[in-house]
Regions:
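Intrinsically disordered regions, especially transient/low-confidence alpha-helical propensity segments
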Residues: 13, 33, 51, 205-206, ...
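C-terminal partner/receptor-binding element of secreted or periplasmic proteins
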Residues: 180-219
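Aromatic-patch recognition
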Residues: 23-187
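Bacterial Sec-dependent N-terminal signal peptides
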Residues: 1-25
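Generic low-complexity, intrinsically disordered sequence content enriched
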Residues: 9-17, 30, 35, 46, ...
Length: 219
């Protein structure tokens, strides 16, 4: 039961206003080195569908009442932290030359000093439509079943600096998960039993596996 509650707190994407204990990093290197800038308040709100269409499908908009800080958060900050929650600024990210656009996406610390971003599909080879997911991993999967958003999201690895402007986000697809599960034959077979490639890329499938492997946890 405790494990289900932990999973729910990790993966449910909510709408709230952040007050206190909020900080941000200006770069990936700052994140790796744990160099955070503390601020008083930031507002985190779910973006409307129309806003996503015109400026990128990222789920969140983070703002500050102070104009100078608001500009930093919108254009310069790399990642924002509020309590145990992380949000990565998609303005700095791309995949296959396609920009993610404005706004923030939910993220989790991955394997210590990397980030696992939960977002829509992006890239030259990705369609805009989302695949549903019918397969779950027992009790672990049950903890995230209520969160339908995860069915329509995929996971990306953010693990290195860029050429100075944009960072490349790596899709956690079947090849990626094959490497992750290379030494875990049983879990690999269970993962491959999920019907359809798009479903195997769903965050609802990927996240419970990463948790079980100890690659993600609460920040």
């Amino acid at each position: 039961m405790m494990r289900k509650l932990l999973l729910t707190s990790l993966f449910i994407l909510t709408v709230w206003t952040a007050v206190g204990q909020t900080s941000y990093c200006l770069s990936y290197d700052d994140f790796v080195q744990d160099r955070w800038v503390t601020v008083d308040t930031l507002s985190v709100v779910r973006r409307t569908n129309s806003a996503k269409i015109w400026s990128g499908g990222n789920d969140y908009r983070i703002t500050a009442s102070d104009k100078a800080l608001d500009k930093v958060v919108a254009k310069q900050a790399f990642v924002v932290r509020q309590g145990d929650s992380l949000y990565v600024n998609c303005r700095h990210l791309q995949r296959q030359g396609v920009l993610f656009g404005k706004g923030y996406a939910k993220a989790l610390r991955y394997d210590g000093d990397k980030l696992c971003m939960i977002n829509i599909r992006c890239g030259r080879d990705e369609a805009s439509s989302q695949a549903g997911v019918a397969f779950m991993f027992g009790a672990v999967g049950a903890a995230v079943k209520a969160n339908s958003m995860l069915k329509n999201r995929v996971c990306y690895l953010i693990d290195s600096t860029s050429d100075g402007k944009r960072m490349e986000a790596t899709l956690m697809d079947e090849d990626f998960m094959g490497d992750v599960l290379l030494m875990d034959k049983e879990l690999l077979e269970k993962y491959k039993s999920v019907e359809k490639e798009k479903n195997r890329e769903s965050a609802a499938i990927i996240l419970p596996i990463l948790l079980k492997k100890g690659l993600i946890k609460a920040f």
